[in-house]
A protein has these predicted regions:
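Helix-start (N-cap) detector for alpha-helical repeat units in TPR-like alpha-solenoids
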Residues: 44, 78-79, 112-113, 146-147, ...
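Structural signature of tandem alpha-helical TPR/SEL1-like repeats
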Residues: 58-65, 90-103, 125-137, 159-171, ...
Length: 366
């Protein structure tokens, strides 16, 4: 790997590539133990049991269909809606997950688990302001919720509110001094602020708490490299790869870290390794497309972002980046179409910053 250049550190994809925020573990057992109102259809209890059976079998699509039928019979049961939201999130359908969690919250607004899960889904849609609002509400409702504070720190980091993120991680550590996730995330804030020595100290604490976590070694390696300690930094990266040699997420994060440091060739190799293990890993394809854009390989970028969109039609940034590649290729009408799709998707997800960016791109072409 090339020696890292001093450039802006861009954080890796939320909740996917090594970021230590727990997915919402909303207990699905609640759906199978719901008291059935005698006034409701007598089929409700059977539907709930059947839905649970499909969950146990891992057939989430059928489980969702069954729970939706149950929800039509019992429109006042927030647990059914939260269960559907959970299953949609498990399948990566975060927009649908948001809608069902919002229905659950409408019925039970003071449920901290629902608020946390809504924040998780919003974060995956890259709607960071909405995610922050939900995570804050979760911390207000459950003052001992460590994961909500870590999640809040993550989305504040994405909004460049580094002091707010640091404070959220401090609060998480105060609640749980053994939270390696909080130390790991705090290390990223310190890296962003250029305080590499402190970042190394914090990340070494995370490594002591979680010696088998490859993601911690990746971040530690970044801090060491950017602090000028090349040999130890590369050793940390090698340790990460050794801990999880077949984990495409590790290669994905290595790619993102290298890309953030402008080592585009090294990043490309890491992304390709990730795809070799998991061909449909969206983040790796998106990273390759961004590198192709940077290298002005516009035809390659167009092809790659089309693949990204095939894999995830709700990825607004892919439409936007494809629009940039089409514009650079003098394919104006196609670029307008891509930017318009980006705008529509950003708006649908409530991402105002993204929508403004897409609107500006459209104005330049019209």
């Amino acid at each position: 790997m090339a020696v890292y250049k001093q450039s802006l550190f861009v954080f890796s994809t939320l909740l996917v590539a090594g970021l230590a925020v727990a997915a919402p573990q909303i207990a699905l057992s609640a759906e199978t133990s719901v008291e059935v109102n005698p006034q409701n259809n007598s089929n409700l209890d059977a539907l709930l049991r059947q839905g649970r059976e499909f969950v146990d079998l891992g057939d989430y699509s059928k489980a969702i269909a069954i729970y939706q039928e149950a929800a039509r019979l019992d429109t006042e049961n927030p647990r059914i809606f939260s269960g559907i939201g959970y299953l949609e999130a498990r399948q990566g359908n975060y927009q649908a997950s948001v809608e069902f969690y919002q229905q659950a919250i409408g019925l039970e607004p003071n449920n901290a688990d629902f608020q946390y899960a809504l924040g998780y889904a919003m974060a995956n849609l890259q709607n960071y302001p909405a995610a922050a609002t939900a995570y804050r509400r979760a911390t207000e409702l459950d003052r001992k919720n460590v994961n909500a504070r870590i999640g809040l720190g993550v989305v504040l980091f994405q909004q460049k509110d580094y002091s707010g993120a640091f404070k959220a991680y401090q609060e998480a550590i105060a609640l749980d001094p053994k939270s390696w996730q909080a130390y790991s995330s705090m290390g990223l804030v310190l890296i962003q602020q250029g305080n590499f020595a402190s970042a190394v100290t914090v990340l070494q604490q995370a490594a002591e708490l979680a010696p088998k976590q490859a993601s911690v070694q990746l971040k530690l390696g970044t801090a060491l490299l950017r602090g000028g300690n090349t040999s130890e930094g590369l050793a940390a990266f090698e340790e990460a790869a050794k801990l999880e040699p077949r984990n495409p997420e590790v290669q994905l994060e290595i790619g993102e870290l290298l890309q953030a440091q402008n080592d585009l060739d090294g990043a490309l190799v890491a992304y390709q390794r990730a795809i070799a293990v998991r061909p449909n890993l969206v983040g790796a394809h998106a990273g390759i497309g961004e590198i192709q854009l940077e290298k002005q390989d516009f035809l390659g970028a167009i092809t790659t972002f089309r693949r990204v969109i095939e894999l995830d039609r709700n990825r607004a940034e892919a439409y936007y980046n494809m629009g940039k590649a089409l514009k650079a290729s003098d394919r104006k009408s196609e670029a307008i179409e891509a930017f318009q799709q980006a705008l529509d998707t950003y708006r649908q997800q409530g991402n105002n910053d993204g929508a403004q960016k897409a609107e500006a791109a459209l104005r330049e072409l019209k």
